[in-house]
Amino acid sequence: MRSPLEEIPGVGRRIAAVMESLGIRQVSDLRGQDPEELYRRECLMKGYQEDRCALYVWRAAVYYAEHPQPDLEKLNWWYWKDRAYPPKGEIFHEFAE
């Protein structure tokens, strides 16, 4: 059965399984989450530092969850390589746009 998390661009069965193991069961569970903290928790759970690309996927996933009409460019995980999410200074990112 396909996970509801697989609707997130760039998230397949394996990444959805990681998200679920961290207690994220649906897209809305990502709203208000800190991608850096989710990445840290993933690394701790696995017992090693996961590739930084996983951090970029977390950033894209949280962005997707928080923006009903997302900028399509920002749905690519590689967009987030050199960009933090939420952008610095944006305190209430869950209410952005």
Label each PLM-derived region with a short phrase:
Residues 1-11:
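Sterile Alpha Motif
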